[in-house]
UniProtKB/Swiss-Prot annotation:
This is Endo-1,6-beta-D-glucanase neg1. Coiled coil: none annotated. Gene3D superfamilies: Glycosidases (3.20.20.80), Golgi alpha-mannosidase II (2.60.40.1180). Its EC number is 3.2.1.75. Keywords: Glycoprotein, Glycosidase, Hydrolase, Secreted, Signal. Residues 1-17 form the signal peptide. InterPro entries: GH30_C, Glyco_hydro_30, Glyco_hydro_30_TIM-barrel, Glyco_hydro_b, Glycoside_hydrolase_SF. Belongs to the glycosyl hydrolase 30 family. GO terms for molecular function: glucan endo-1,6-beta-glucosidase activity; glucosylceramidase activity.
Length: 488
């Protein structure tokens, strides 16, 4: 739907009112598959067992004492691609401000984690580019480094978002190094030797280092250029989906041992020498190869304290994150990419947010934040033609899509600094129906419980807190419902 400024002011007033109410009593908000609930206030849960009447019932438990404390929330959000920036910049200043308030402020979704593309991705208009293409000719001094119009627009958009959301964490990920740094010499269109020319593949790291140093300095220059435009880059991954290569658009293989050595010997030291506090997150790919980030941590743990995961494994299994946590308890984890196609199930965004949170993820980012009405702009070759943004821009206005509301059921009520709590009782049957839940202790002392109901009927849910309280209320059919409970 289109959101007017008047409606936004009304929502802002509601936000302030409900914030005051939460201090003394419980509240509940819901978004559902039918679209008649969109972060809508519904009947609040009551203390005790309540009265389920003839409804189905479900029992959940939450350990809201110190023994139940798990990971700390960093934030939720999406990918800021060239498609996002291009589409957003077609809006008038007032409409864009209205939209960004809906995305970045507590009155809206309160997004606080944005992953942006360093150069082109599949969601860029033609032609594909990096920040130092140099006409395809080698530029070992990086004298041709330039953000260009699209990189500059990206940095300015992120800076504007940061001005609205002081807690915003910005993660940058490249889809490829400049073509001249690669063994095949091209940015896209060729999967043969689609690897960085860094010496590790051609000489096992004992001979020529190729362009490893230049690749490291490329990150330094990019981070400094963004900082100069007001966008502090909090973290990078050194390659998006490093085990994937495709002809037609920018991709690049970076193997696990190669990633580890690039970080340990080049990128980590380069960032440190430049006085940059930007973190390096390992991997940025699917859950089916956990040995990859483990190798990086084992060999480059001096510079890597976080791991990024995607959702595209044939059988995505978020418990991999719990297993990884058990081996690496001091390492933060994030779900940094999962797409939201228009044809996807209503609960797709809820699923790829809920599962990682239940398994030690500190943040979740969807693919992508915004697109135009044609799910673009995207590259004509290799571009994603079915990647719908959380927001669709059309004819000078915008539509907040289902995935936006499903993610906001988490992000709006689990702010940065919230502590995820241990819980039990979540279950989904083979037919797809079930109840999934995650809870948090928030910085202001309130507690949040997010309940995803994929059944075709309402369910009366009772949550038993280890602190001694019991809360009960309705979770409407095919919905995500968020309870905000007062301090224990």
């Amino acid at each position: 739907m289109r959101i007017s400024v008047g409606a936004l002011l009304g929502l802002t007033a509601l936000s302030h009112a409900t914030t005051e109410k939460r201090a003394a009593s419980a509240s509940a908000y819901c978004s559902n598959s039918a679209g008649n609930y969109k972060l809508s206030s519904i009947a609040a849960p009551v203390q005790g067992a309540g009265n389920p009447g003839s409804e189905s019932t479900w029992q959940l438990t939450v350990d809201d004492t110190s023994s139940g404390h798990k990971q700390t929330i960093v934030g939720f959000g999406a990918a800021v691609t060239d498609a996002t920036v291009t589409s957003f910049n077609t809006l008038s200043a007032s409409v864009l401000q209205d939209l960004l308030n809906k995305l970045m402020t507590p009155a809206g979704a309160n997004f606080a984690l944005m992953r942006h593309t360093i150069g082109a991705s599949d969601l860029s208009g033609d032609p594909a580019y990096t920040y130092d293409d140099n006409g395809g000719k080698a530029d070992p001094s990086l004298s041709g480094f330039n953000l260009g119009d699209r990189g500059t627009a990206m940095a300015k958009m992120l800076a504007t978002m940061k001005s609205l959301q002081p807690n915003l964490k910005i993660l940058g990920s490249p889809w490829s190094a400049p073509g001249w740094m690669k063994l095949n010499g091209v940015l896209d269109g060729n999967t043969n030797n689609n690897n960085l020319n860094d010496g590790y593949l051609t000489s096992g790291g004992t001979g020529s280092t190729g362009y490893a140093s230049q690749f490291a300095q490329y990150f330094v220059k990019y981070i400094q250029a963004y900082k100069n435009l007001g966008a502090h880059v909090d973290a990078i991954t050194i390659q998006n989906e490093p085990l994937f290569s495709s002809a037609g658009y920018p991709t690049m293989y970076v193997y696990d041992y190669e990633s580890a050595q690039l970080i340990q010997n080049y990128i980590g030291p380069a960032l440190a020498s430049a006085g940059l506090d930007t973190e390096i997150w390992a991997y940025d790919h699917n859950t089916d190869v956990p040995s990859y980030p483990q190798t990086v941590l084992n060999q480059a743990g001096q510079y890597v304290k976080s791991v990024a995961w995607h959702c595209y494994a044939p059988n995505v299994d978020w418990t991999v994150l719990s297993q990884f946590h058990n081996t690496n308890p001091g390492v933060k984890q994030y779900m940094t990419e999962c797409w939201t196609p228009a044809s996807g199930a209503w609960h797709q965004a809820a699923d790829f947010t809920m599962g990682p949170l239940q398994n030690w993820a500190s943040g979740v980012a969807a693919w992508t934040l915004g697109t135009n009405a044609q799910d673009g702009p995207h590259l004509s070759t290799g571009g994603c033609a079915t990647c719908q943004g959380l927001v669709t821009i059309n004819n000078g206005g915008y539509t907040l899509n289902t995935a936006y509301y499903m993610m906001a059921q988490f992000s709006k009520f689990m702010p940065p600094g919230a502590i995820v709590l241990n819980g039990s009782g979540s279950y989904t049957y083979s037919g797809g129906g079930g109840i999934q839940s995650v809870a948090s202790l928030n910085p202001d002392g309130t507690r949040t419980v997010v309940i995803e109901n994929t059944f075709g009927n309402d369910v009366y849910v009772t949550v038993t807190m280890k602190s001694g309280q019991k809360w009960s209320g309705n979770a409407p059919s095919q919905s995500v419902t968020t309870w905000v409970l007062p301090s224990a």
